[in-house]
Amino acid sequence: MVKLVFARHGESEWNKANLFTGWADVDLSEKGTQQAIDAGKLIKEAGIEFDLAFTSVLKRAIKTTNLALEAADQLWVPVEKSWRLNERHYGGLTGLNKAEAAAEFGDEQVHIWRRSYDTLPPEMAKDHEHSAHTDRRYAHLDDSVIPDAENLKVTLERALPFWEDKIAPALKDGKNVFVGAHGNSIRALVKHIKQLSDDEIMDVEIPNFPPLVFELDENLNIVKEYYLEA
């Protein structure tokens, strides 16, 4: 039996301000920093020992991963970063206050953009200050694969190869894995792991804290699923 632990990053400065974040590289808030540390303490108390860890290339997830592993006294655990674990790209909504977006586009439209499985938000302009096309961390990627907007369906399509190439093989090899990522990239992987329908995943929320644990058998069937508690 192996353990897969998902930790959504702690509260970010833009979470706190109620802004659409997506691929914008926003830092943790003071509360978010503490949530990451507390996540690590829960992991230590639960006696979970990791063999490797994965995170995105966005600082809020990277810092959460490092802080949690440090608090769990496992900072030595190898960490691999991948853009495939990034948050869903919110396109032209990035940086907008969610309440202001609702006032501008209407509550129903914004709700559809946020919660529909396969409806895309407006695309981000190539010259937007948060465009990934000019960001050095994505320079190794073909420009055609860098998104300008994503829904959960596209987020899953982007994250799934990383699951199949990196995470799943490690679990099948008997390794315990920590994944420090984002609300929607985790939701996408949870949809795959639990084989949820497009409608079922819409009701799934991943909190900033505490971490979510899956205990899996050798075929990666779920034996147990739970959130860590103090």
From Swiss-Prot:
Pfam families linked: His_Phos_1
Disulfide bond entries: none
Reaction catalysis annotation: (2R)-2-phosphoglycerate = (2R)-3-phosphoglycerate
Gene Ontology MF terms: phosphoglycerate mutase activity
Active site: residue positions: H9, E87
Superkingdom of source: Bacteria
GO BP annotation list: gluconeogenesis; glycolytic process
Isomerase found in the keyword field: yes
Protein family according to the UniProt entry: Belongs to the phosphoglycerate mutase family. BPG-dependent PGAM subfamily.
Name under which the protein is recorded: 2,3-bisphosphoglycerate-dependent phosphoglycerate mutase
Organism whose genome encodes this protein: Streptococcus suis (strain 98HAH33)
Taxon lineage: Bacteria, Bacillati, Bacillota, Bacilli, Lactobacillales
The encoding gene: gpmA
